[in-house]
């Protein structure tokens, strides 16, 4: 199995894409990327991510926006409940003082399931959660 792990790591080093959400430990930015990329290819989601985080650089700016503006920045991505859930979760987090720090708290955010909570906690906080999506399960 050690050989498999080495092969997998080498493949990743040779094939990884340089994406902004892979260069940060900021849980907010990782959360935004994970939600945008649900049911969306990276090639399409990339520009939306850039525009969205430029306008809403943190949970407080997203929480302060009105829903119509959030929906305007989401327009074209589809699955609009994702944008509504982001906005509702941002308002909840802003009221609580910021982004949650535990898996249980992240999982409790509106629109966040086990995969997204694991991704945020693993990538942002270095917690030992496996980030396993439906493709891996299949």
Language model: regions and residue ranges:
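Short, low-complexity, intrinsically disordered N-terminal peptides in bacterial proteins
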Residues: 1-4
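Catalytic cores of DNA base-excision repair glycosylases
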Residues: 6-7, 11-138
